[in-house]
Amino acid sequence: MLTIIVCGDNIFNRFSVSENATEEFFMCTAITYKTEDFYFGRNLDYEAGYGESVVVVPRNFPFGDEKEHYAMIGTAHVLNGYPLFYDAANEKGLCAAGLNFVGNAFYGKEIEGKKNIAQYEFIARLLGSCADIAEARDFLSDINITDTPFCEGLPSAQLHWMIADKNGCIVVESMRDGVHVYDDPVGVLTNNPPFPIQLFSLNDYMALSPKSPENRFSPDLGLKTYSRGMGAMGLPGDLSSRSRFIRAAFVRENSLSGKSENESVSQFFHILGSVEQQRGCCEVRDGEFEITLYSCCFNADKGIYYYKTYENGGITAVDMRREDLDGKEIVSFPMKNETQIFFEN
């Protein structure tokens, strides 16, 4: 059970925004979805990519001192042979994604007696060690996320994380007052403000419905609906992280699809599409605009990673189980960004 405190010395007092926030923020949305299988994925929103690829990491690829771990697949920027994951899922079905949390994320120095993990290795260490959400909770019970950089000139990204499998979903936020682990009953995460505030804000929208509204304004007035969709009037439509959280939660909660793989994957991308960004709508600097660089969907039960990019709206898939998961070398698939158009004549 998640307890939300909304007064006194609480999460509101911990929420801050850096002076250069407009320059530092980039926006993302992560969701879960379940039909016959469990699905997990996200939009990554930014103004430019960093050469990210879909990466399969086999069990015997060396992560520092760890020579053996669960195999995993995800989106990463591979630097000096090391996959810096944006999001990933392991062979057991546990998934994780890092989302921007500027102004609130805080990583300190190593603490004796704690499980010290650098921010850049958080996803890899977690998914390499934990088979499910219960093991992830135990893994996080004594964790200290440090500001140790991957290399000189590459500072730690300010993130928080959504972690999930078919049995549950949690959010991890490392702030100045410690590491917080929250249950996530809606299976959605965006960026700022901190997760408890995002979740509490759903109370303002409890009257929204996919059904047509009834006239409760006045029995003396002959008020009638004049359009479909009026039950959701008031649902935020802007691109701010708070509004995307509310919109994604509403769409996910009311989303219906068939149980087949194609129907499930298609619906998953439609849910993410409700909060995707189009070039020109979110200016971050003169002439520079944030867009949804890619959207991804993991079938966590089958080990398949699906994605589409801003320029390529077709769905591309990588199946981790078609690779040698007992190998020692990562397998990298650069994202296909070229627009693909199917002509019927």
Predicted regions and their residues:
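Beta-strand residues in well-ordered beta-sheet regions across diverse protein folds
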Residues: G41, G98, E173, Y306-K308
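Short, surface-exposed beta-strand-loop junctions and turns on beta-sheet-rich folds
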Residues: Y46-A48, V102-N104, D177-H180, G187, ...
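Proteins synthesized as precursors that undergo proteolytic processing into mature forms
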Residues: G113-P149, E261-H270
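Active-site periphery "cap/insert" segments of enzyme catalytic domains
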Residues: A134-S174
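C-terminus-biased signal that marks the final domain/tail of proteins
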Residues: E23-Y33, Y39, T148-C151, S156-A157, ...
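Short, Lys/Arg-enriched N-terminal segments with co-localized hydrophobic residues
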Residues: I4-F26
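A contiguous strand-loop segment
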Residues: F25-K115, D142, D147, S332-K336, ...
